């Protein structure tokens, strides 16, 4: 639809393994509602997270060790879960959780 919210979703450093090994997705979300990072995380959990949700989600947020960047800016500087997503935002999730 013309009023859909279009985003680029990127997953790297192992986060993509939880989402079917797809590192980059173009999303088109229902533009009739307000989308925040928090609502995007719920959508991701319900629609594209394919395994081990406990490695990505903890409560209502990402697990510690998952960095979130919005247009190359740390999401915490933008309001964290409450950041309202904008047309053509690039959301990047980077896992810093590694075995050893």
From Swiss-Prot:
Keywords carried by this UniProt record: Cytoplasm, Isopeptide bond, tRNA processing, Ubl conjugation pathway
Pathway participation: tRNA modification; 5-methoxycarbonylmethyl-2-thiouridine-tRNA biosynthesis
GO cellular component, one term: cytosol
Top-level lineage group: Eukaryota
Modified residues (1-thioglycine): 100
Subunit architecture: Interacts with cer.
The family this protein is said to belong to: Belongs to the URM1 family.
Role noted for this protein: Acts as a sulfur carrier required for 2-thiolation of mcm(5)S(2)U at tRNA wobble positions of cytosolic tRNA(Lys), tRNA(Glu) and tRNA(Gln). Serves as sulfur donor in tRNA 2-thiolation reaction by being thiocarboxylated (-COSH) at its C-terminus by MOCS3. The sulfur is then transferred to tRNA to form 2-thiolation of mcm(5)S(2)U. Also acts as a ubiquitin-like protein (UBL) that is covalently conjugated via an isopeptide bond to lysine residues of target proteins such as Prx2/Jafrac1, Ciao1, Eip71CD and GILT1.
Name under which the protein is recorded: Ubiquitin-related modifier 1 homolog
Species of provenance: Drosophila willistoni (Fruit fly)
Encoding gene, per UniProt annotation: Urm1
């Amino acid at each position: 639809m013309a009023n859909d919210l279009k985003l680029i979703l990127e997953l790297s450093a192992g986060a993509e393994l939880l989402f079917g090994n797809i590192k980059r997705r173009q999303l088109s979300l229902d533009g009739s509602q307000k989308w925040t990072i928090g609502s995007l995380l719920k959508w991701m959990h319900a629609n594209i997270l394919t395994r081990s949700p406990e490695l990505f989600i903890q409560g209502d947020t990402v697990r510690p060790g998952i960095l979130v960047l919005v247009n190359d800016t740390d999401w915490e500087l933008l309001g964290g879960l409450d950041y309202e997503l904008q047309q053509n935002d690039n959301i990047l999730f980077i896992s810093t959780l590694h075995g050893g």
